[in-house]
A protein has these predicted regions:
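Active-site mouth loops of central-metabolism enzymes
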Residues: 65-82, 139-153
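Feature activates predominantly on carbohydrate-active enzymes
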Residues: 48-69, 91-96
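Aromatic- and carboxylate-enriched substrate-binding clefts and catalytic-loop regions
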Residues: 101-267, 271-275
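Catalytic domains of carbohydrate-active enzymes, especially glycoside hydrolases
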Residues: 80-103, 160-167
Length: 306
């Protein structure tokens, strides 16, 4: 059944019904069917229902692996020395990117985001930065919350960080399928492509195949991923869930699950105990397809293993 966004989605006050003018082209609706699971698993149907790429020279669009300090210790995104450790770890591992999540604008303890980007560039590691989508934040007093939703501010910010050498952006908290927010996705991707920025859409809707038109879109969350493992009931069902999503969610597009977590995630002081094996976690790095494969655990968790 085709449904409009829920009225209860309060992020933006817009009506749930879309508005347009004629000629009006409605989206494709597709069903993927195959005689075997491999046919479904390997399909690119959703991508192929989109217009061809508008990016001429795409040699700068490179998939890769990333480290990420936020999952285990959120406050570390503001700590310069911690982020430098992650850059060094990436360099040693041969991973291409490091993601600095929310809070990097207030970085201290010896340096700034700009300093991390410069150092990472010398090590051959590309830096990604987190941004709020701006959904529902038009009147927010925090200016950084509007950097992606306001076209003028967005382009200025993208130009600024591109000049610094930032390689990608993770845009988060879209939080609704109302028309204005759906239209924000291609607007962000288009501007990001102009400034040679890769994109991860987090807290976002189910993939729509935008990556064919804008191949700088590397991945989309839209999955109950590792961020939810702070609850024991999620850990208890993780093995079953992880064995299912390659044939459901991952079929329609790259999946930002943030896998390979060996540590027990602590939420409000209470650890949720991992119920999957080390082998299971390692397999997720291969089984889950994502152009930006962000490994979520702390450095020590990876270094402690053989």
């Amino acid at each position: 059944k085709i449904r409009f966004p829920e009225i209860e989605e309060p992020v933006v006050p817009d009506a749930v019904e879309p508005v347009s003018t004629f000629p009006w082209y409605t989206p494709w609706r597709a069903i993927i069917v195959g005689k075997e699971l491999n046919t479904v698993f390997r399909t690119q149907m959703v991508s192929h229902l989109n217009p061809p790429s508008v990016i001429g020279d795409d040699s700068w669009i490179l998939p890769g692996r990333a480290s990420w300090s936020w999952w285990y210790a959120g406050g570390t995104t503001r700590d310069y020395k911690t982020q430098i450790k992650y850059v060094d770890f990436n360099h040693a591992m041969g991973w291409e990117y490091v993601l600095i999540d929310a809070g990097w604008q207030r970085m201290d303890n010896g340096g700034t985001m700009e300093d991390v980007v410069k150092y990472a560039g010398e090590k051959g590691v590309g830096v990604w930065l987190w941004y709020h989508s701006g959904a529902g934040r038009e009147m927010d007093s925090i200016p950084t919350h509007r950097l992606m939703s306001d076209p003028v501010l967005r382009r200025a910010e993208m130009e600024r960080i591109s000049r610094l050498g930032v390689r990608g952006i993770k845009v988060d908290f879209f939080d609704t399928d109302k028309q204005r927010i759906i239209q924000l996705y291609p607007a962000i991707l288009k501007d990001a492509a102009e400034f040679y920025l890769l994109v991860d859409l987090h807290g976002a809707t189910l993939p729509r195949g935008f990556e064919r038109t804008y191949p700088n879109l590397m991945t989309t969350e839209a999955i109950r991923g590792a961020e939810t493992l702070g609850r024991q009931e999620r850990c208890d069902r993780a093995a079953e869930h992880n064995a299912t999503v390659p044939f459901t969610r991952n079929v329609v597009g790259s999946m930002d699950y943030t896998p390979v977590t060996f540590s027990d995630k602590v939420r409000q002081g209470i650890p949720a105990i991992r119920q999957t094996t080390v082998a299971h976690q390692l397999a997720l790095a291969v089984v889950f397809e994502s152009g930006f494969q962000c490994y979520a655990d702390r450095i020590e968790a990876y270094e402690e293993l053989p």
